[in-house]
């Protein structure tokens, strides 16, 4: 009887693979078609964001956050603004809080639509992404009408938002909700009820409650395992404690459960959007959209045409910026991909001393090796899709 030495072979997945979610390079060690080891190589989109922020004023640093998770930009700005507001003790007007809450939920729809439909494309269904991008286009137009930009909005400000929403935009957001829910139902039938989609996703990448905690997962990754942990409920910020919505949780902790949760979260986001629209129309929802503290918010433009003091105030605010009291703070938001946190250290000057960004995708990607082990090569893209990785925030 002859002996054969069976040697595992290694292949590269990415960084230019369509399912690699950006610039991910995975070095896969395979025994036949079974995955033995996954080695993620990150850093191909590293831009030194945290260091760049240290050399910018607080206002100039805000646009960097759009470029982290570029699928849902405003959610990232939100965490940075919350951190500054907590350090400086800035009070945000109610209308600004409502607008922020509304656009964070629009960001959640943008992210989940992309993830669920491209997950279907990764397993071979080509129609859902076309439907998803059609809806995302409408949401991006809302972004554009609010901030002037489709993608990198730079709309949130410490103390509020940049501009008020026109009444027609609020009406259009309300009109968007009902037809969108029908599209979600159609996607449910087309994707979630599809037997091939189920065969490819059920019992793949199972994560238990203890494992989710041990790996430092957040967002859909913990809710898929049955833990109802959502910062909007457990540590409410802005006006989420006033909103009525449910937290969908899974029971199997597999890839399929996580995608079902994303579908349900889109329905819950629409609920929150409707409540925000209703509250924006109430008398209590009227008023300023930025802090009335002149140290942090610029004067109205009409005043700058008449008042020399207002012009000087505006000039100082946009050249030197405002000074944040010395201290350190951690602010986190429930971004679509998980807990997005900003640890901000101020030395009392007009620039952050240190700004550490806690990206949810970074914690999720480290579990790639453990989740894929023993699965087939074809399942790697399913597991990667369910982690919902965006490389802007992983590499920073």
From Swiss-Prot:
It is found in: Cell inner membrane. PROSITE patterns: COMPLEX1_49K (PS00535). Its EC number is 7.1.1.-. Transmembrane segments: none annotated. It catalyses: a quinone + NADH + 5 H(+)(in) = a quinol + NAD(+) + 4 H(+)(out). It is an enzyme of class 7 (translocase). Pfam families: Complex1_49kDa. Disulfide bonds: none annotated. It is a peripheral membrane protein. It comes from the Bacteria. One of its GO terms (molecular function) is NADH:ubiquinone reductase (non-electrogenic) activity. Keywords: Cell inner membrane, Cell membrane, Membrane, NAD, Quinone, Translocase, Transport, Ubiquinone. InterPro entries: NADH_Q_OxRdtase_suD, NADH_UbQ_OxRdtase_49kDa_CS, NDH1_su_D/H, NiFe-Hase_large. GO terms for cellular component: plasma membrane. NDH-1 is composed of 14 different subunits. Subunits NuoB, C, D, E, F, and G constitute the peripheral sector of the complex. HAMAP family: NDH1_NuoD (MF_01358). Belongs to the complex I 49 kDa subunit family. NCBIfam families: NuoD, PRK06075.1. NDH-1 shuttles electrons from NADH, via FMN and iron-sulfur (Fe-S) centers, to quinones in the respiratory chain. The immediate electron acceptor for the enzyme in this species is believed to be ubiquinone. Couples the redox reaction to proton translocation (for every two electrons transferred, four hydrogen ions are translocated across the cytoplasmic membrane), and thus conserves the redox energy in a proton gradient. This is NADH-quinone oxidoreductase subunit D. It comes from Methylorubrum extorquens (strain PA1) (Methylobacterium extorquens).
């Amino acid at each position: 009887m002859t002996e054969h030495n069976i040697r595992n072979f290694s292949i590269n997945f990415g960084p230019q693979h369509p399912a690699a979610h950006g610039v991910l390079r995975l070095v896969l060690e395979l025994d036949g078609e079974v995955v033995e080891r996954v080695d993620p190589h990150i850093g191909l989109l590293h831009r030194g964001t945290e260091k760049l922020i240290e050399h910018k004023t607080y206002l100039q640093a805000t646009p960097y956050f759009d470029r982290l998770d570029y699928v849902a930009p405003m959610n990232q700005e939100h965490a940075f603004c919350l951190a500054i507001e907590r350090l400086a003790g800035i009070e945000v007007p109610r209308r600004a809080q409502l607008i922020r809450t509304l656009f964070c939920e629009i960001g959640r729809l943008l992210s989940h639509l992309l993830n669920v439909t491209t997950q279907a494309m990764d397993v071979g269904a080509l129609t859902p992404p076309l439907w998803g991008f059609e809806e995302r286009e409408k949401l991006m137009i809302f972004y554009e009408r609010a901030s002037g930009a489709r993608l990198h909005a730079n709309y949130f400000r410490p103390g509020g938002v940049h501009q008020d929403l026109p009444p027609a935009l609020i009406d259009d957001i309300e009109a968007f909700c009902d037809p969108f829910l029908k599209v979600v139902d159609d996607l449910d039938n087309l994707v979630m009820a599809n037997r091939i989609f189920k065969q490819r996703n059920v019992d793949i990448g199972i994560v238990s409650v203890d494992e989710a905690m041990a790996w430092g997962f957040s967002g859909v990754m913990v809710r898929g395992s049955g833990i109802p942990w959502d910062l909007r409920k457990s540590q409410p910020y802005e006006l989420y404690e006033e909103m009525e919505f449910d937290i969908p949780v899974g029971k199997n902790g597999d890839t399929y459960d996580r995608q079902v949760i994303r579908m349900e979260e889109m329905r819950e986001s629409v609920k929150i959007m409707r409540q925000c629209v209703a509250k924006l129309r109430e008398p209590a929802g009227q008023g300023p959209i930025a802090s009335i503290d002149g140290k942090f918010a610029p004067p109205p433009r009409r005043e700058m045409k008449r008042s020399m003091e207002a012009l000087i105030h505006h000039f100082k605010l946009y050249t030197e910026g405002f000074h944040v009291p010395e201290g350190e703070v951690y602010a986190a938001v429930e971004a679509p991909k998980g807990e997005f946190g900003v640890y901000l250290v101020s030395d009392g000057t007009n620039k952050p001393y240190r700004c550490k960004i806690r990206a949810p995708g970074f914690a999720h990607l480290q579990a790639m090796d453990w989740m894929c082990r023993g699965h087939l090569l074809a399942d790697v893209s399913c597991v990667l899709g369910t982690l919902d990785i965006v490389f802007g925030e992983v590499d920073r």
